[in-house]
């Protein structure tokens, strides 16, 4: 499989290493600013890369969105987070002409976490729910795209829920419809996501901890391996 990388930060550097270990080939890189240290052919436009089988994106909206407005037809794996609604609308449009895969978290374990959460919410309907995510001190966006995905699962199963990001200015008791959303930034934490169900005299916690960023890179590669054989359409872990 011949792979074009969109972005060449820490994550796509891992994708390159792991993909080559699997026998795949990196045919080029698209970056905001070309760098002399990048060990692959650098391009400005997706359509300029004639021999790629798939593109894997671990970048940012500033790099990705202009590329998505260009004319190209290439299977696309997208892991960029930020401006999610705008991104999903654009990817849905592109999926009419090419296979597109999107996940805010490329770990299959996190996908399993969403399924566990979907099963737990109806069973624990009278429990309070708090969501917490923790990441390294260089992560810019908060809350994480994964935590937003977990919140979306809850919204799909409970009525009239309210996200609460900060209780500092709230001078009232917790309301039943509140869903607490908390972000922690520090050190080199790869990624942790926890769902707390708090009931009367008991709590249940469901936690996913990433121990290496390799799980995200491998998840993107595995998605690409499947996507190249798919017809045009929008794909997630649910239908890939």
Curated annotation (Swiss-Prot):
GO molecular-function terms, A-Z: 4-hydroxy-tetrahydrodipicolinate reductase; NAD binding; NADP binding; oxidoreductase activity, acting on CH or CH2 groups, NAD or NADP as acceptor
Catalytic function, reaction form: (S)-2,3,4,5-tetrahydrodipicolinate + NAD(+) + H2O = (2S,4S)-4-hydroxy-2,3,4,5-tetrahydrodipicolinate + NADH + H(+); (S)-2,3,4,5-tetrahydrodipicolinate + NADP(+) + H2O = (2S,4S)-4-hydroxy-2,3,4,5-tetrahydrodipicolinate + NADPH + H(+)
Classification via SUPFAM superfamilies: Glyceraldehyde-3-phosphate dehydrogenase-like, C-terminal domain, NAD(P)-binding Rossmann-fold domains
Protein residues bound to NAD(+): 79-81, 103-106
Stated role: Catalyzes the conversion of 4-hydroxy-tetrahydrodipicolinate (HTPA) to tetrahydrodipicolinate.
Family: Belongs to the DapB family.
The protein's name in its UniProt record: 4-hydroxy-tetrahydrodipicolinate reductase
Species per Swiss-Prot/TrEMBL record: Staphylococcus aureus (strain Mu3 / ATCC 700698)
């Amino acid at each position: 499989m011949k792979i074009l990388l969109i972005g060449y930060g820490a994550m796509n550097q891992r994708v390159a290493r792991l993909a080559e270990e699997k026998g795949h080939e990196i045919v080029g890189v698209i970056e905001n600013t070309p760098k002399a240290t990048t060990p692959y052919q650098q391009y400005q436009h997706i359509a300029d890369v004639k021999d790629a089988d798939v593109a894997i994106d671990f970048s940012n909206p500033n790099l990705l969105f202009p590329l998505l407005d260009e004319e190209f037809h290439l299977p696309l794996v997208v892991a960029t987070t930020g401006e999610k609604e705008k991104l999903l609308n654009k990817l849905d449009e592109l999926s009419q002409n090419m296979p597109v895969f999107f996940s805010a978290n490329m770990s299959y374990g996190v996908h399993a976490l969403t399924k566990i959460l979907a099963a737990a919410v109806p069973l624990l309907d009278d429990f309070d729910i708090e969501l917490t995510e923790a990441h390294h001190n260089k992560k810019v966006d908060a809350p994480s795209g994964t935590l937003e995905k977990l919140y979306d699962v809850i919204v799909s199963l409970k009525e009239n829920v309210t996200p609460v990001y900060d209780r500092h200015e709230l001078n009232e008791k917790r309301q039943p419809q509140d869903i607490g959303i908390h972000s922690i930034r520090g050190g080199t934490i790869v990624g942790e996501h926890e769902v707390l169900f708090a009931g009367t005299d008991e709590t249940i916690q469901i936690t996913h901890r990433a121990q290496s960023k390799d799980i995200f890179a491998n998840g993107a590669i595995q998605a690409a391996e499947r996507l190249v054989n798919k017809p045009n359409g929008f794909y997630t872990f649910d239908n890939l």
